[in-house]
A protein has these predicted regions:
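Core catalytic lobe of class I
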Residues: 2-10, 27-34, 38-297, 307
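Arg/Lys-rich, glycine/proline-spaced intrinsically disordered segments
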Residues: 12-22
């Protein structure tokens, strides 16, 4: 089934659960400071749902209809590969569980103006695709979160919350020249305009968050999350990505802001954790990844999931 047909087939389904709200259309933003040139994409591209595509999100997603996506989970490049970011490769460094090597990925090392232009470009496309009732979750660190925040403001994308993901099991800082980086930033945002985004408020209070040492049962969820970054062996059975996130984190996003049957967009799919979470939670999904090797890993992970 093509994407357009699949999306149209949901128009007559009952409204989802959640706090009462009006269905309103968010006001679009015109940003004259956006330096991005438009992408020209053939109009004959047809994308199917529940698939990860090899290629550039901005180019391939141009064939998707406006306001067709319920939730976006984005883990874009942090632009952190400036010669000082370390990533563990299993090896023989005593006391730290492995040898440490610098990340040297081309996709994670851009001049500042180029990175801002890239961020504006993909966020503008994400906003176009997001429903007024939808929202997006965007990962970042101190290298990127500030730029993402500014880009959202330039595009009149409203930030709902800034979340601190505290990682108790963070790798130590080997240089002894700075504090150990033990958190990442997550921006939860909607497309702007009237606040019609879905929020499963009762779940945020009463859900099972036993893996979070800071969450108080029965109390409102706060914006500091204590979730371990370790991945179970089955999440890396077919290979791994240097910036791979645990599936449990994407499942939290989904349970807070989506419903079964919703469409989840993953612009930077990597090895597929967010798509795996979407499938396991009963969502439809569509993902994009530029590296064919990671696409293959992601597809193997998805194929290994038992159908409900």
């Amino acid at each position: 089934m093509s994407t357009n047909t699949a999306l149209a087939s949901r128009s007559d389904q009952p409204k989802r659960r959640g706090r009462p709200r009006k269905d309103v259309t968010a006001q679009g933003a015109s940003v004259t400071t956006n330096p991005i040139a438009p992408h020209h994409v053939p109009s004959n591209i047809t994308l199917d749902l529940n698939e990860i595509y090899t290629g550039n999100f901005i180019e391939l997603a141009a064939s998707l209809p406006d306001k067709s996506v319920d939730i976006i989970i984005a883990d874009p490049p942090y632009n952190a590969s400036k010669g000082n970011i370390l990533s563990m490769q299993y090896g023989n460094l005593p006391g730290f569980g492995g040898a440490w090597q610098k990340i040297a990925e081309v996709w994670d090392d851009m001049p500042l103006d180029q990175y801002l232009a890239f961020t504006l470009s993909w966020l503008a496309e994400a906003k176009r695709l997001l429903k007024p009732t939808g929202s997006m979750w965007v990962h970042g660190t101190y290298h990127s979160a500030g730029i993402t925040n500014v880009a959202m403001q330039m595009l009149e994308i409203e930030i709902i919350n800034e979340i601190i993901w505290y990682k108790r099991n963070s790798f130590p800082n080997l240089s002894g020249r700075r504090l150990t980086a033990s958190h990442e930033t997550i921006l939860w945002a909607h497309r702007g305009g009237k606040r019609a985004y879905n929020f499963n408020y009762e779940h945020s209070k009463e859900g099972d968050f036993s893996d979070d040492q800071l969450k108080v049962p029965g109390k409102q969820m706060r914006t500091v999350w204590d979730l371990p970054n370790n991945k179970p062996r089955n999440e890396q059975a077919f290979g791994k990505h240097p910036a791979q996130k645990p599936v449990r984190l994407a499942k939290r996003f989904i349970r807070l802001s989506a419903q079964p049957g919703d469409l989840c967009l993953v612009p930077f799919a990597g090895s597929g954790s967010e798509c795996v979470a979407a499938k396991q939670e009963g969502l439809r999904f569509i993902g994009f990844e530029t590296d064919p090797a990671y696409v293959e890993i992601a597809r193997q992970r998805l194929n290994a999931i038992d159908e409900p």
